[in-house]
């Protein structure tokens, strides 16, 4: 007895256990096994079911694997180099690891071969109620072992051997390659030399026996001759397929033997294995390729299969190589004329190509309407439709199932079978495949419908990927490249439509309604997440707006899920809920019931935001009965809050938790207004907060009175309701903060930070949040208020709460902790709070608060009243001087304070080492002080008039009365009066007068009484002196100089002054020297103003008003800017006319030259 049949140690002893033993008596078509299988993929035309999820570890680790799957009995026979394994996949129900019988095989001498697995097959039993037999062929030695049943093979280790053995006489370097069952008890074996052997398992009497017979073919005869001549270098013949029609087929007596080169031999097994036809199909195949693929090269036949319904129809799988990849094609031939086959159908595999040549198998479905091309990493289903009238009229299309070899390990086994589950059920067609790491799967074809269009195909494939690609351990590869071929707008529309189908439970891949609505909602939410995960994993080019829309769907689904959970937790039925009865009635117009509520939650997820408005409206309607039914009204408010909080908070929670899925920040939004922060939602949230607060305030104020009207047990209920409302108010505050923050971020993202709309929302948020936080503090939830303020970085509220809740050292410690925690932003808010609340001196208290940010604060704020003191304390006199100068220049309006600030600034400048910047600031300070000095000099002549009129009772219209007194009997133009009124008003208030306005006032001295001017200094001199301290443009300075000199000339009547009749020299000299023009020239010369930049007119005619259009005049002359430019122009023109009159009628120009010479000699 050989080692194959000899007693061996069976390591799988558990296989013999009655509990785990394979039962072949069990019904082979038990539907329970199929119904409980796990679907890896369910498509419209097919589904992929997991029949066995895991092999035994010994099988997985014993590579390479081969084998076959016998669907009649539900067994799998798997071969390796060391053993063969038998297992039943039907008892695993798709998940469990089944009992496995192991048959160790003897080691063989490689004999120069790289090694090959044993050839094995189940042998059908003579009786239907018996186990099948087992046939094992060792490929190198040619030894054959046969057992009439698996039980006998299993008992080989324990009892006397009950098997039979034979031997194939192989030539040197010959090995067995293929094993084919031609009838139940007859098998055909082919070798690498092309020889064929017939193995008969019954003798003529029908008893079990093993007999081997060599086929009488040309190749066999040739091999025999070479053997007798002792020539052993036989040519190797690459037989790729050894196929016979299915058992019980009328054509089963034929055997087709195909070689890779295209050679085909047909044997008739009834005629003692006679060769009836031999041909070379390569010319036919090449002719087909030349018509469709001119660049094809390297034609090779990979496999053949025979149509089970038409034994004359044989399909071949051929491949060829173009410039880049290997391409595949199915060519079907009709062998009605066995010597001259004709081409019936050609189907190139458009959806598959490979860079290297892959081992491939071709299978027909039992109906002949489908072909399965099984490769290592893919299964291609080719659907073939046949016209009943004309067999040549055939169309085909294909479905591709790609396998992830990293998960599955690659397909090593495949077979086809047709089974019927029941008497009246529709026959199904299946292909069974096996992979090392993912077990056995069944591909069941149940439809041959062609997709309506490309978009429907893409949507269906995308939907399949969403529902099945994320199943744990799924070996199918869903990385569909065709998604990138569709246009971007179409793909985005498909994605959004699919999301809506999932959200509204319209997808056919969603499971039937669970008993628990919570599970159904969770399934939909998970599917939406998987849709986004798949889009991200495939790196599809979709716009971010699509992702925002999907995120909104997920938010609403999550909100409904949490809301339903709240209902299930808090209210076991709708009848226990006061608010949901009314809400469902309003929304569905039907009686409130559990089913109505459930139906609404199933089909109205998209309208979940309506519940917020409905809950709030019901609260308002119930509020009118608070005196009659206080507890019921508080319950309604509490339930409404539960609804609103569940919806709003869960939406934000989903957005936060799904950031990794969507790769979208929680602070970014789509173009549409976020549904959780629409203007209507913000209003409703604020009103609900106020409503809850009002109910709490009333309950706190009237607790004792209300409790007296209740029974003892109801008092505890009331306290519990009030406590719950307080907790809800804290949660409502957070929801309101989230909604407003979200609204602000969306407007900033859409319109920018400077949009007018955002300012309105920020102002409303600033007002409301102080109210919300203060409310929490008022009801005794100060710690919660501080927590919320900390969470949302509401620094202003934090500061206010600290001053409300803490005192002295506790307050100092809290503020210092926040300064350390939040840094400069909190510091700025705190410092602003000090200034706004009259606590500015706190900023100078260096012992109490951290001042590390104070310098930066003063740089960013215009608080010069305090910041200069801080700079002075730090010894930064330059900065202190600069701040004082800014304060005096831009902010201060009172004369005395401005003079003090400028004086201090000057003092600080003297304390700083001199540099160019300090010199400029010092000049500016001197000029400002000079302006104030001139103003004070002028006001001294006005204030006595003011005091006199006040003592006379002139309290009303005092300014007009003072101006009238100053003008006296003179006639002044309107613009002169207006300038005087403005200046006098500021004199009375002690305010600073602008330099240009004071210039105008001084230059209008010709319209005031003469007795107002004291001493030798004229107003015109002061005006020129003031002009030197200003920083006007050159044009403006020239205009003012001419105006001042012109009005100084017009101040006196030169016709009278220069009239010498009846005057002696002394009188003439006195009048000449007392003129305003002379005194102004004298004062200017004596005080050196001409050396400081003032230009003396060369002639008085140059002082005329000429060459100014209205626009230029407005830009340089304030009275023209604030008044009527036409009237101002008339006044200036009249002055020029009068000046020209003097120059024409008198020798004023000569006198002016004499005045200049006289002043020069002083």
Swiss-Prot record:
GO cellular component, one term: nucleolar peripheral inclusion body
InterPro entries, per database record: Nucleoporin_Nup133/Nup155_C, Nucleoporin_Nup133/Nup155_N, Nup133-like, WD40/YVTN_repeat-like_dom_sf
Molecular-function GO terms, alphabetical: structural constituent of nuclear pore
Alphabetical list of Pfam families matching this protein: Nucleoporin_C, Nucleoporin_N
Chief location bin: nucleus
Any one of the GO BP annotations: replication fork processing
Keywords, comma-separated and alphabetical: Nucleus, Transport
Location within or outside the cell: Nucleus envelope
Family: Belongs to the nucleoporin Nup133 family.
Annotated function: Functions as a component of the nuclear pore complex (NPC). NPC components, collectively referred to as nucleoporins (NUPs), can play the role of both NPC structural components and of docking or interaction partners for transiently associated nuclear transport factors. Active directional transport is assured by both, a Phe-Gly (FG) repeat affinity gradient for these transport factors across the NPC and a transport cofactor concentration gradient across the nuclear envelope.
Subunit text: Component of the npc107-120 complex which consists of nup85, nup107, nup120, nup131, nup132 and seh1. Interacts with nup107.
PANTHER family according to UniProt: NUCLEAR PORE COMPLEX PROTEIN NUP133, NUCLEOPORIN NUP132
Entry protein name: Nucleoporin nup132
Native source organism of the sequence: Schizosaccharomyces pombe (strain 972 / ATCC 24843) (Fission yeast)
